[in-house]
Amino acid sequence: MQEWLEILLIHTLIDSSSLSPQRLRVMNRIISSQGSDLIKQKLSQHTSFFGIKLWILITASASIAFLLVLIISVLLCFIFHRRRCSQEPFRLRSKLCLPLSHIPLTNKQQIPYNRCGDDIESQRISQVGWSSARLSYYTRSFSSTGSFGSFNVFTFMEIKNVTDSFADDNVITKGDSSTVYRGILMGTVTVAVKRFLPSNSRYEDKDFITKAEMIANVRHKNVVRLLGYCIEGDERVLVYEYAEKGDLHEWLHGSAGRNRPLTWRKRMKIIQGVAKGLAYIHEDIEPKITHQDIRPSKILLDYQWNPKILDVGFIGHSDIPTLIPSPGNMDEKIDVYSFGNMIMELVSGRVSVDQSSPHVRVYLVDWIKEMVANHMIVDVLDPSLPEFPTIKELKRIVLISLRCVDPELKERPKMGDVIHMLQPHDLLLNNNAIQKAQKITRSHEVSAISIRQ
């Protein structure tokens, strides 16, 4: 320390103008060297804090301070984002509903929308405005595991842009009461847009909305999810999640099935998935819902061949979709019968009612029963199958289908029981069940003979 003071004293007393530049550079170098050595000496000294060196203590303190600032910043950003998600209205409808040609939307409406997908224990209904002609805004936010995070209300202009003004190229299927179109949301997300014919739009807005919102709460892997709706004037539109493989009817009786027939394993996967979906809506939710129109065209298939039941809670043959709570088990038994008939279509590859011959209708259920009664069960198999099941497996599946189409309602199993029956070693498929199926086929044979006489 004394050497350092002496150098400073010399430096201040001597007139720098009398020194040559070379001597000044030497003196500055000496001063810098002395100062550097002093700093190193101080930093290398042990402190009273557990004897840690000063430079280590300073470095550790700076690192801890930096981490604390970083953590606090991240927490503040997260809290701000959560508050913003739960409070701000959704103002990105133009980005959500991009048309296929990416034309910007006009006359956009701001609709409350939960983009975060957070769990909401108490569901809330946000009703912003009503008019005599139509419902202006109405949305219900709830927890979602899908891409959008809540139930959506679309304007008809948005629906038109999503489907390119309902272009014929986007038609997926046409029915007696509606047409289903392919649409694009957010420029990349494909959806199915179901537009009902104007003749099916005479019901009040509140009724349609209540039914749609109840169906939106149905969440199951084997049920097509309802993403939102549109209601303006006479227009009634439902927006569903999209299934990449199309409907089962196309794979059984259309061009897709002729080019690439479904394997036995895929058919069994479809049967099991539909059974689980029906058991869910029959037994696991309140109010219970029945479908009443189970058929291959109502079963959609995703890219992994998982079946998804379409139009859950809506009667397919009515003028407008109507929610049907099941007061008893009669409606459920109708679904069980339709499910058994669908199994027969999957096993045989035949349509439910064959009208290829003029003035003759051949019902698949009757044909299967006749083949079983005549011990020709092998002949019921779809000849286009890439590989055939074992006789034991075939008998098991046909037996299940026969139990489902039992003429006696009380003898038809519940869908929950059917799921157990589909397991390879289920106790429900015992000798008594086999005798019951044989009794059904024999009674059918007797009735058929009496009709001929």
UniProtKB/Swiss-Prot annotation:
Residues spanning the membrane: 60-80
Location of the protein in the cell: Cell membrane
Gene Ontology terms: cellular component: plasma membrane
Active site positions: D293 (proton acceptor)
Modified sites of kind Phosphotyrosine: Y240
Coiled-coil portions: none
Residues in Protein kinase domain copies: 166-428
Presence of the UniProt keyword Oxidoreductase in the record: no
Pfam family, one: PK_Tyr_Ser-Thr
Cross-referenced InterPro entries: Kinase-like_dom_sf, Prot_kinase_dom, RLK_Ser/Thr-Kinase, Ser-Thr/Tyr_kinase_cat_dom
Topology versus the membrane: Single-pass membrane protein
Domain of life (superkingdom): Eukaryota
Family, similarity comment: Belongs to the protein kinase superfamily.
Name of the protein in question: Putative receptor-like protein kinase At2g30940
Naturally occurring in which organism (per UniProt): Arabidopsis thaliana
